[in-house]
Design a protein with these regions (language model features):
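A mature extracytoplasmic/lumenal domain signature
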Residues: 33, 52-54, 62-64, 124-128, ...
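Short regulatory "switch" loops immediately downstream of catalytic or recognition motifs
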Residues: 55-63, 85-92, 148
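Short hydrophobic/aromatic-rich beta-strand segments that constitute the beta-sheet cores
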Residues: 58-59, 122, 154-155
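Short, solvent-exposed polar/charged micro-motifs at secondary-structure junctions
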Residues: 69-70, 115, 165-170
Length: 180
């Protein structure tokens, strides 16, 4: 009898963890992006990287200083780029005497949950401003989000990014980001 109860409890736990733990709903997707915004405001690249799946892939087309660049990244390279970007923001903030703040906003344009409730396709726009006029990064992305093992993660991203800035005494972002 003990073994039967144990087997039922173990089976229930496995079902809850593997099956029910992979169901995704609109609220979870919206909370994922809200957490991404909090991580950005906190300037926490590690937390942003933890929101990516181990199989994460990004295709990006960037428009910087009149030049177009196409690139693809896996998770490790994407995380490296995020860390470099935050380091750049920190360096520019220090050069400006700590007066350059980061503003981040996002708009979910479309959110489609798959019929099996395990993934979602999200069309989203984001804007990141540093010092209001110093630098602005605009992106339009189509993201694929999944829930697996009770965690919501970003699996794939197709993005178009535009950067513009006011040339000034602090830095030349086009040189920094194109060198990367």
């Amino acid at each position: 009898m003990k073994y039967l109860v144990f087997a039922l409890l173990a089976g229930g736990a496995v079902w809850f963890y593997l099956i029910d733990g992979s169901k995704l709903d609109e609220g979870m997707v919206r909370e994922f992006y809200a957490q991404q915004a909090r991580n950005t405001y906190e300037r926490d690249p590690e937390a942003l990287c933890k929101q990516m799946s181990g199989k994460y892939r990004m295709n990006i087309q960037s428009h910087i200083a009149g030049k177009v660049n196409d690139a693809s990244y896996g998770k490790s390279l994407a995380c490296e780029q995020i860390k470099k970007s935050f380091k750049f923001f920190e360096d520019m903030g220090e050069r400006a005497g700590g007066i350059l703040t980061i503003e981040y906003s996002y708009d979910i344009r479309r959110l489609d949950i798959a019929s099996n409730n395990r993934s979602a396709t999200v069309e989203i726009t984001t804007t990141l401003k540093m010092g209001e006029e110093f630098m602005q990064i605009f992106s339009e992305s189509t993201d694929r989000i999944e829930r697996s093992m009770r965690q919501v993660v970003l699996v794939a991203q197709d993005s178009k990014v535009r950067m513009r800035w006011t040339p000034g005494a602090y830095a030349h972002p086009e040189q920094y980001f194109q060198a990367q």
